[in-house]
Amino acid sequence: MAAIIVVGAQWGDEGKGKATDILGGQVDYVVKPNGGNNAGHTVVVGGEKYELKLLPAGILSDNATSIIGNGCVVNLEALFEEIDGLQARGADTSHLRVSANAQLVAPYHVAIDRVSERFLGKRAIGTTGRGIGPTYQDKVGRVGIRAQDLLDESILRQKIESALDKKNQMLVKMYNRRAIEPEEVVQYFLSYADRLAPMLIDSSKVLNEALDRGERVLMEGGQATMLDVDHGTYPFVTSSNPTTGGACVGSGVGPTRITSSLGIIKAYTTRVGAGPFPTELFDKWGEYLQTTGGEVGVNTGRPRRCGWYDSVIARYASRVNGFTDYFLTKLDVLTGIGEIPICVAYDVDGVRHDEMPMTQTEFHHATPIYETMPAWDEDITGCRTFEELPEKAQDYVKRLEELSGCRMSYIGVGPGRDQTIVINDILKD
């Protein structure tokens, strides 16, 4: 039995898709426990590039059943567009299942998300405008629509009519937009009911029975630790808990069944959207990382903000997630840059902080304290063992390991599935 959680350790886009793709071929189930089509994965298989949003990266593994968990919010139009796109490229999606308890994104969620961001103006959080936040708000407010509701039209209709009593008042009176007809939303959902119904399962039951049989389960977290609604840079966060604890809740698998928690972390740092970012670069090196690393959001198309590696955040992520291992990605991007600064602590109004400041005010005032290490000039994209890496690259990885509070068990040296160095195989430990 093995239950592994994959979690982003920074602000997302760390390469979780690659990690899941590599491990997904060795497990029996891959479950996405949180998020929706607001976060994307890029996976390269056989030279083919796949950009996944709502679907787990494990969908590209023929041997694994992929599950969209109860902690997810599902836009059905986006789901089936993604499925159809993969099938058109020859991918098999017949092994995809959806938790009956997953929340559904309604057209009014998307409308409210988009208009509210415009209404906020300069105070906008920087959402993707896909209705994720409003859907989670309805979930917590106990007025959400779940996937299983499509199996009973009377319940579906009742929930939609009740929701629109309030939503339309908000759209019309607060945002000066047109009201949405309940029947329009009912028909939208019913148009997908026949296709969705065969996919629905009790995901908690399925996953726990699989573990009882000694099978392997991989939980593929969306977004990242610093976007967690509790542990991230609030309010510049997502609306779910993309941390280890949230993965347990969003999949229905208890914490005592988890055998490994794998943090995915870049050899530098990126962020999309608004919010504090202590190591952010505004010079030629920021542009270099953005260009060389291909740092453009899969979902939004927005350029990612880039900065140096932040070990304060890495230590924080190790602590709140209980990571057993790290998967370091994009080490190859740092080849040939001369010197590599590493943030080892923060200066906050003249006081050194080796750990995350307690308040967001302090974090906004944090300036990085750097140490530097020499970069390497050799091409590392063909390295397949740690010993094959140049000595300077080895030293950089070892220093990150010392600073981050967790062993570096995997190292990405290129975008391909095979461009990975495995130091400790967590499926064999």
UniProtKB/Swiss-Prot annotation:
<comment type="function">
    <text>Plays an important role in the de novo pathway of purine nucleotide biosynthesis. Catalyzes the first committed step in the biosynthesis of AMP from IMP.</text>
</comment>
<feature type="binding site">
    <location>
        <position position="304"/>
    </location>
    <ligand>
        <name>GTP</name>
    </ligand>
</feature>
<protein>
    <recommendedName>
        <fullName>Adenylosuccinate synthetase</fullName>
        <ecNumber>6.3.4.4</ecNumber>
    </recommendedName>
</protein>
<keyword id="KW-0658">Purine biosynthesis</keyword>
<feature type="binding site" description="in other chain">
    <location>
        <position position="302"/>
    </location>
    <ligand>
        <name>IMP</name>
    </ligand>
</feature>
<feature type="binding site" description="in other chain">
    <location>
        <begin position="38"/>
        <end position="41"/>
    </location>
    <ligand>
        <name>IMP</name>
    </ligand>
</feature>
<comment type="subunit">
    <text>Homodimer.</text>
</comment>
<feature type="binding site">
    <location>
        <position position="13"/>
    </location>
    <ligand>
        <name>Mg(2+)</name>
    </ligand>
</feature>
<feature type="active site" description="Proton donor">
    <location>
        <position position="41"/>
    </location>
</feature>
<dbReference type="GO" id="GO:0046040">
    <property type="term" value="P:IMP metabolic process"/>
</dbReference>
<feature type="binding site">
    <location>
        <begin position="12"/>
        <end position="18"/>
    </location>
    <ligand>
        <name>GTP</name>
    </ligand>
</feature>
<keyword id="KW-0342">GTP-binding</keyword>
<feature type="binding site">
    <location>
        <begin position="40"/>
        <end position="42"/>
    </location>
    <ligand>
        <name>GTP</name>
    </ligand>
</feature>
<keyword id="KW-0547">Nucleotide-binding</keyword>
<feature type="binding site" description="in other chain">
    <location>
        <position position="223"/>
    </location>
    <ligand>
        <name>IMP</name>
    </ligand>
</feature>
<dbReference type="GO" id="GO:0005737">
    <property type="term" value="C:cytoplasm"/>
</dbReference>
<feature type="binding site">
    <location>
        <position position="142"/>
    </location>
    <ligand>
        <name>IMP</name>
    </ligand>
</feature>
<dbReference type="GO" id="GO:0000287">
    <property type="term" value="F:magnesium ion binding"/>
</dbReference>
<feature type="binding site">
    <location>
        <begin position="330"/>
        <end position="332"/>
    </location>
    <ligand>
        <name>GTP</name>
    </ligand>
</feature>
<feature type="binding site">
    <location>
        <position position="40"/>
    </location>
    <ligand>
        <name>Mg(2+)</name>
    </ligand>
</feature>
<keyword id="KW-0963">Cytoplasm</keyword>
<dbReference type="GO" id="GO:0044208">
    <property type="term" value="P:'de novo' AMP biosynthetic process"/>
</dbReference>
<feature type="binding site">
    <location>
        <begin position="412"/>
        <end position="414"/>
    </location>
    <ligand>
        <name>GTP</name>
    </ligand>
</feature>
<dbReference type="GO" id="GO:0005525">
    <property type="term" value="F:GTP binding"/>
</dbReference>
<feature type="binding site" description="in other chain">
    <location>
        <position position="128"/>
    </location>
    <ligand>
        <name>IMP</name>
    </ligand>
</feature>
<keyword id="KW-0479">Metal-binding</keyword>
<feature type="binding site" description="in other chain">
    <location>
        <begin position="13"/>
        <end position="16"/>
    </location>
    <ligand>
        <name>IMP</name>
    </ligand>
</feature>
<keyword id="KW-0436">Ligase</keyword>
<feature type="binding site" description="in other chain">
    <location>
        <position position="238"/>
    </location>
    <ligand>
        <name>IMP</name>
    </ligand>
</feature>
<feature type="active site" description="Proton acceptor">
    <location>
        <position position="13"/>
    </location>
</feature>
<dbReference type="InterPro" id="IPR001114">
    <property type="entry name" value="Adenylosuccinate_synthetase"/>
</dbReference>
<comment type="pathway">
    <text>Purine metabolism; AMP biosynthesis via de novo pathway; AMP from IMP: step 1/2.</text>
</comment>
<comment type="similarity">
    <text>Belongs to the adenylosuccinate synthetase family.</text>
</comment>
<dbReference type="InterPro" id="IPR042109">
    <property type="entry name" value="Adenylosuccinate_synth_dom1"/>
</dbReference>
<dbReference type="InterPro" id="IPR033128">
    <property type="entry name" value="Adenylosuccin_syn_Lys_AS"/>
</dbReference>
<dbReference type="InterPro" id="IPR018220">
    <property type="entry name" value="Adenylosuccin_syn_GTP-bd"/>
</dbReference>
<dbReference type="InterPro" id="IPR042111">
    <property type="entry name" value="Adenylosuccinate_synth_dom3"/>
</dbReference>
<dbReference type="InterPro" id="IPR027417">
    <property type="entry name" value="P-loop_NTPase"/>
</dbReference>
<dbReference type="InterPro" id="IPR042110">
    <property type="entry name" value="Adenylosuccinate_synth_dom2"/>
</dbReference>
<dbReference type="Pfam" id="PF00709">
    <property type="entry name" value="Adenylsucc_synt"/>
</dbReference>
<keyword id="KW-0460">Magnesium</keyword>
<dbReference type="GO" id="GO:0004019">
    <property type="term" value="F:adenylosuccinate synthase activity"/>
</dbReference>
